[in-house]
Amino acid sequence: RDRGRKRKAPPVKERAVELGIPVLQPEKIGKNREFLDTIRGADADVIVVAAYGRILPKEVLEMPALGCINIHGSLLPRFRGAAPIQAAIIEGDEETGITIMKMAEGLDTGDMLAKASTPIDGKTGQQLHDELSVMGAELLMRTLPELASLEGEKQDDRLSTYAPMISKKDGHIDFSQTAARIERTMRAFDPWPGTYAYCSDKMLKLRKAETLDKASDKEPGTVIEAEGDHIDISCGEGILRVTEIQAPGRKRAAVKEYLKGNSIEIGTVLG
């Protein structure tokens, strides 16, 4: 949906329509005989899946001669699941990447065909998503011509981790965590779902921050400084220095601008 909450076609569909490629958008696949018969009738050599988020039924996996392959946004077997990009940032990994894999009946458990990596540095979820999208397309184009002869590498299930689907409520900040983890979560959830805390009964979205390697004896969530261009908040470990904020119904703004028209009392506990 766009910002007016109206349904908007995904870019892939828009481009497919421009090229005259048939587009099918079933809500469910498993028992949709019309859809399944259409896919079977295409007599495809390979099915490519990207950002689908659901497990394909065995019937579909067995249709193409060369199988179904998935472009997954992590270095498998780490971060199987729906939100691998955000998980890699939150967990503090130094790098992440793309894995081209043969699809199996399990969730992201198939043999790995190709990988490409990139450093995470201080990237946001959106920045990393955009970078991995390009990497994934390039890696796919290098992999497809060799697909018939490629021998996949089995995943070591002992090294697997899971990245569950994200919801809006996951953006509610838990200040008992370390400042470093909270800052990583803020980057991972930028722009969606965003991270937020409550000041009395008002929700504030905390958009950008850095960490201070200082100790505080205040309760986690306590505002210990709010002046100039920052708001400092005590955490389970360290201090979170917020530099960009968003009030309800307003655009995101630098804390310096926010504090010109708003005040936050020292000692206020954000929840």
Residue ranges and their predicted role:
Residues R1-P191, D201, G238-R241, A247, ...:
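One-carbon transfer enzymes
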Residues E183-G271:
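C-terminal active-site/capping subdomain that shapes the small-molecule cofactor and substrate pocket
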